[in-house]
C-alpha cells in the first residue's frame, strides 16, 4: 500500500478546514478552552517510508482519552487479562463517556469498558509502582519508547486544570471504591489520571503510536517487539467498538479502522500492517471527537481503501 503524499494531505486539509467552524472547544477543562479552534494537522507514519505531515502537525497537544489505550496495554502487561477484565467489562455503552448510569444499573457493578472514564480510572488504578512518581514515569517511558521521542512529558498546567475541575470523575471513583472495583486513595488516583491525560504529543508522535499498533506492537524501524501482539489485538478491538465515544459505530461505517480520540482534538488510527495516522483538530463535534479530524479520516479511508470491513 502506497503512503499518501504530502501534497495530497495539504489539499485534504484545505478541503475539510471549513468543518472547524462547526465545532467547539472542550471548555469544561479550562486549559483546553485556550486552544485555537482553527488549528488542524495530520501526520501519517508508514512502515517503510517514515512519515508525511501537513498543517499544525508539530503543535503540541495533550493525549486526554487517547492515553486510555496506553494504560490499558500497560495494565494488561502488569496484571494480565483475567484480573483486568474481572474489574472492567468488554462491552460498548450508549451513554456519554463520563456517565455514571451503567455503574448504578448494571449487575455486577463494574465499568462496561476501558475506554469510558470509569473504566479508564479503574485501569489506571491497576498500574504497578511504589508511588505516583514511579507510575507516571512508567507511563511516560512507555509512550517515549512507542513514539521514539525521549522528550515526551506531561503538561503540569493542563493536569492541574483537570484536577481542579474533575468532580464527576471523583464521583465515579468513590462509587467504584464502594463496590470494590478500586481500593486506591481517590486523590492519589485522580492526580495520576490527570497527569496521564495531560501527556503532550504532536501529530507525528501520535502517528507513530498508530504505526506500532498497526504492526501488532512491532517497531519496524527499531526491529523490536515493543508490545505483545495479543495485547495490541485487545486494544485495537476496543478502539473499533468504543474508541470514538458515542460515534464509534458511525466511525466504523464511514472510516472503518481502529482509532481513538481525545477531547484535546487528537485522533490516532491504524491501518493494519501498513501505517499509523495522527490528527490534531481541537474543534469538537457534539460527541467529543475532532470534527474536521473525523472528516479527513473519512475522505482518506474512501480514497485509499483503508476500511477493515
Swiss-Prot record:
GO molecular function: glutaminase activity
InterPro entries: Beta-lactam/transpept-like (IPR012338), Glutaminase (IPR015868)
Keyword Hydrolase: yes
Gene3D superfamilies reported for this sequence: 1.10.1500.10, DD-peptidase/beta-lactamase superfamily
Pfam families: Glutaminase
Reactions catalysed according to its record: L-glutamine + H2O = L-glutamate + NH4(+)
Domain of life: Bacteria
GO BP: glutamate biosynthetic process; glutamine catabolic process
Tagged with keyword Hydrolase: yes
First-level EC class: hydrolase
Subunit description: Homotetramer.
PANTHER family for the chain: GLUTAMINASE
Classification via HAMAP family: Glutaminase
Family classification: Belongs to the glutaminase family.
Protein name: Glutaminase
Native source organism of the sequence: Bacillus cytotoxicus (strain DSM 22905 / CIP 110041 / 391-98 / NVH 391-98)
Amino acid at each position: 500500500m502506497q503512503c499518501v503524499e504530502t501534497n495530497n494531505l495539504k489539499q485534504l486539509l484545505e478541503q475539510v478546514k471549513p468543518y472547524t467552524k462547526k465545532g467547539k472547544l472542550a471548555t469544561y477543562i479550562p486549559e483546553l478552552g485556550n486552544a485555537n479552534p482553527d488549528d488542524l494537522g495530520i501526520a501519517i507514519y508508514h512502515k517503510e517510508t517514515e512519515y508525511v505531515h501537513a498543517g499544525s502537525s508539530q503543535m503540541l497537544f495533550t493525549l486526554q482519552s487517547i492515553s486510555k489505550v496506553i494504560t490499558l496495554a500497560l495494565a494488561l502487561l502488569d496484571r494480565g487479562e483475567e484480573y483486568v477484565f474481572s474489574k472492567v467489562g468488554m462491552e460498548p455503552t450508549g451513554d456519554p463517556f463520563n456517565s455514571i448510569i451503567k455503574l448504578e444499573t448494571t449487575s455486577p457493578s463494574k465499568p462496561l469498558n476501558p475506554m469510558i472514564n470509569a473504566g479508564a480510572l479503574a485501569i489506571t488504578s491497576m498500574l504497578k509502582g511504589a508511588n505516583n512518581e514511579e507510575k507516571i514515569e512508567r507511563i511516560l517511558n512507555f509512550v517515549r519508547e512507542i513514539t521514539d521521542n525521549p522528550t515526551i512529558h506531561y503538561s503540569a498546567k493542563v493536569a492541574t486544570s483537570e484536577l481542579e475541575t474533575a468532580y464527576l470523575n471523583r464521583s465515579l471513583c468513590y462509587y467504584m471504591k464502594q463496590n470494590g472495583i478500586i481500593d486506591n486513595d481517590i486523590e492519589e488516583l485522580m492526580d495520576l489520571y490527570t497527569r496521564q491525560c495531560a501527556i503532550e504529543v504532536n501529530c507525528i508522535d501520535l502517528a507513530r503510536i498508530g504505526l506500532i499498533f498497526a504492526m501488532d506492537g512491532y517497531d519496524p524501524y527499531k526491529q523490536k517487539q515493543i508490545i505483545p501482539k495479543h495485547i495490541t489485538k485487545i486494544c485495537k478491538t476496543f478502539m473499533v467498538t468504543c474508541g470514538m465515544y458515542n460515534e464509534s459505530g458511525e466511525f466504523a461505517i464511514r472510516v472503518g479502522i481502529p482509532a481513538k480520540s481525545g477531547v484535546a482534538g487528537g485522533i490516532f488510527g491504524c491501518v493494519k500492517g501498513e501505517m499509523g495516522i495522527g490528527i490534531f483538530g481541537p474543534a469538537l463535534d457534539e460527541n467529543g471527537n475532532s470534527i474536521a479530524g473525523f472528516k479527513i479520516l473519512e475522505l482518506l479511508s474512501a480514497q485509499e481503501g483503508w476500511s477493515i470491513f
